[in-house]
């Protein structure tokens, strides 16, 4: 189970932070002159609703477009759902599927009410295929309800330093 947690955390970091750093011990010589000629023209319009470009070393924001704009957490919610589930349960727990979980919209595994699965299997489904029904089944198992699990997500988000972040569902869909 710890191996799964490590793989998920590493995957999440690589996929969602987009921070790149140099290899340890590598020595670089800074050139005396740097060609500052743009490689390409700046796009006339950035198509993303919001964007932030940050220096990975200093944390300084280099570019921002509506960086404070509230947006849906989307599938990044599922990463935190997985982390909270791993911290509050065991992979060999049996999870019974409710009607609420079974009735989630696409993308879904196709869980049916009354079926039982190992939590570990549902976590794989959640992280590899982003299944909405497995997120709800996991949430109901670990938090007693979607609402209870949302409180757990919000506590964890605050604990790890997330600001202006609020979870309502374990799958990132609108409530």
Residues covered by each model-derived region:
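Active-site-adjacent loops and short helices of periplasmic peptidoglycan-processing enzymes
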Residues: 23-175
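Sec-dependent N-terminal signal peptides of Gram-positive bacterial secreted proteins and lipoproteins
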Residues: 2-22
């Amino acid at each position: 189970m710890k191996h799964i947690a490590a793989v998920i955390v590493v995957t999440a970091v690589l996929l969602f932070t987009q921070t790149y750093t140099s290899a340890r011990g590598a020595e670089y010589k800074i050139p005396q002159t740097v060609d500052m000629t743009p490689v390409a023209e700046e796009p006339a319009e950035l198509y993303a609703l919001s964007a932030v470009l940050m220096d990975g070393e200093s944390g300084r924001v280099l570019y921002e477009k509506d960086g404070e704009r509230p947006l849906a957490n989307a599938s990044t919610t599922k990463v935190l759902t997985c982390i909270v589930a791993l911290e509050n349960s065991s992979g060999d727990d049996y999870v019974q599927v409710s009607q609420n979980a079974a009735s989630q919209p696409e993308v879904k595994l196709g869980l049916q009410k009354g079926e039982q699965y190992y939590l570990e299997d549902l976590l794989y489904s959640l992280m590899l295929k982003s299944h909405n029904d497995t997120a709800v089944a996991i949430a109901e198992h670990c938090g007693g309800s979607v609402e209870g699990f949302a409180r757990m997500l919000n506590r964890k988000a605050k604990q790890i330093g997330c600001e202006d972040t609020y979870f309502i569902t374990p799958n990132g869909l609108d409530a």
